[in-house]
Amino acid sequence: MKISANSIRTGNILVYNNDLWVVSKTPEHTQPGKGGAYVQVEMKNLKTGTKRNERFSSADYLEKAELEQKDYQFLYFEGDDLVLMDTKHFDQINISKEMLEEKLSFLTENMIVKIEFYNDKPLNIELPPTVILEISETDPVIKGATATASYKPAILENGIKVKVPQYLEIGEKIVVKTDDMTYVERAK
């Protein structure tokens, strides 16, 4: 499917120079004083992992990879792989832990994730937008602390460090965004 350079977004997977590239940063739209407008795009090659900056004219059209998305349930770790099961057909697949990188610590047993495939090859794992985790370490509650904008550091059960409001204590469950690893709210 062709998309205009102005429509490129972070996370898009493009077919460029016969390779698959994922857009890794928000594209910068620039309108110089002289010359035509262009879009500066930082991309990462999905095969080699190399990064590249490309400049496309606003009038350019690029090929967006058509991906098939399926729901999978995470079962367990096997060496350097994740073992996941298709929720519809119950087929199991192994995928390298490297595909999740720093978000690996959010993965919990039986979690449902979305896997994007291109020509039956897994390219990307998408976690749920938020997860509920327990606070395992933080400073004690300060008397009189209210839900103001003052935050303290906390370490969650999976080892991730986040800033939480002063009134939260060890053992409480909180909602955390998986994309930027930030506190959302106390779990209900």
From Swiss-Prot:
Subcellular location(s) per record = Cytoplasm
Superkingdom, taxonomy of origin: Bacteria
Q: What is its main location?
A: cytoplasm
Q: Which GO terms describe its molecular function?
A: translation elongation factor activity
Disulfide-bond pairs as recorded: none
Keywords recorded for this protein, A-Z: Cytoplasm, Elongation factor, Protein biosynthesis
**Parts of the chain that traverse the membrane:** none
Q: Which InterPro entries does the entry mention?
A: Elong-fact-P_C, NA-bd_OB-fold, Rib_uL2_dom2, Transl_elong_fac_P/YeiP, Transl_elong_KOW-like, Transl_elong_P/YeiP_cen, Transl_elong_P/YeiP_CS, Transl_elongation_fac_P
Q: In which pathway does it act?
A: Protein biosynthesis; polypeptide chain elongation
* Pfam families associated with the record: EFP (PF01132), EFP_N (PF08207), Elong-fact-P_C (PF09285)
Query: What are the recorded Gene Ontology BP terms?
Result: peptide biosynthetic process
| Example of a GO cellular component annotation carried by this entry | cytoplasm
CDD domains attached here?
S1_EF-P_repeat_1
Coiled-coil regions, chain positions: none
Family indicated by similarity:
Belongs to the elongation factor P family.
Q: What does this protein do?
A: Involved in peptide bond synthesis. Stimulates efficient translation and peptide-bond synthesis on native or reconstituted 70S ribosomes in vitro. Probably functions indirectly by altering the affinity of the ribosome for aminoacyl-tRNA, thus increasing their reactivity as acceptors for peptidyl transferase.
This protein is called what?
Elongation factor P
Native species: Rickettsia rickettsii (strain Sheila Smith)
Q: Which gene encodes it?
A: efp
